Curated annotation (Swiss-Prot):
This is 2-C-methyl-D-erythritol 2,4-cyclodiphosphate synthase. It catalyses: 4-CDP-2-C-methyl-D-erythritol 2-phosphate = 2-C-methyl-D-erythritol 2,4-cyclic diphosphate + CMP. 4-CDP-2-C-methyl-D-erythritol 2-phosphate binds at residues 8-10, 34-35, 56-58, 61-65, 100-106, 132-135, 139, 142. Involved in the biosynthesis of isopentenyl diphosphate (IPP) and dimethylallyl diphosphate (DMAPP), two major building blocks of isoprenoid compounds. Catalyzes the conversion of 4-diphosphocytidyl-2-C-methyl-D-erythritol 2-phosphate (CDP-ME2P) to 2-C-methyl-D-erythritol 2,4-cyclodiphosphate (ME-CPP) with a corresponding release of cytidine 5-monophosphate (CMP). Homotrimer. InterPro entries: MECDP_synthase, MECDP_synthase_CS, MECDP_synthase_sf. One of its GO terms (molecular function) is 2-C-methyl-D-erythritol 2,4-cyclodiphosphate synthase activity. The keyword Lipoprotein does not apply. Pathway: Isoprenoid biosynthesis; isopentenyl diphosphate biosynthesis via DXP pathway; isopentenyl diphosphate from 1-deoxy-D-xylulose 5-phosphate: step 4/6. The record marks 34, 133 as: Transition state stabilizer. Belongs to the IspF family. It comes from Photobacterium profundum (strain SS9).
């Protein structure tokens, strides 16, 4: 049994939608990123990579590599999870916290859980996604960007 923690943040800019947890959320702006800017899936990738001692998402999908420009983060997550399985582990459970003043995440949480569960080949009951605000404090509170944290438990197969 191993645990991993991940964190990601992206700044608003350009046109929407915002992609979070593999789900497109209508919003007046998108997130500035080399890939699709999905902070939730990036945090999950980092948590999984951390759990197997394999560094971070930037090491595996560097933003200096044109191959990953505009990449679908669901593809990245599936690739990372294949590395987890190659090391002899499977997901136990996952807990994700999205920190954003806007857009509102609640209507999209179930779809996020479903998408993530599919990509991680697990029962939806093993995936929890929640959202909170920072009570209008800091960059997320000023609607300048979105942050996300993820914690995973993986077990030997």
């Amino acid at each position: 049994m191993r645990i991993g923690h991940g964190f990601d943040v992206h700044k608003f800019g350009g046109e929407g939608p915002v992609i979070i947890g593999g789900v497109a959320i209508p919003y007046e702006q998108g997130l500035i990123a080399h890939s699709d800017g999905d902070v939730a899936l990036h945090a999950v990738c980092d948590a999984l990579l951390g759990a197997i001692g394999a560094g971070d998402i930037g090491r595996h999908f560097p933003d200096t590599d044109a191959e990953w420009k505009g990449a679908d983060s669901r593809f990245l997550l599936r690739d990372v999870y294949s590395k987890v399985k190659d090391k002899g582990y499977r997901l136990g459970n996952l807990d994700v916290t999205i920190i954003a003043q806007a857009p509102k995440m609640a209507p999209y949480i179930d779809a996020m859980c479903q998408a993530i569960a599919e990509d991680l080949e697990t029962d939806i009951g093993n995936v929890n996604v929640k959202a909170t605000t920072s009570e209008r404090l800091g960059f997320t509170g000023r609607k300048e960007g979105i942050a996300c944290e993820a914690v995973v438990l993986i077990n030997a197969q």
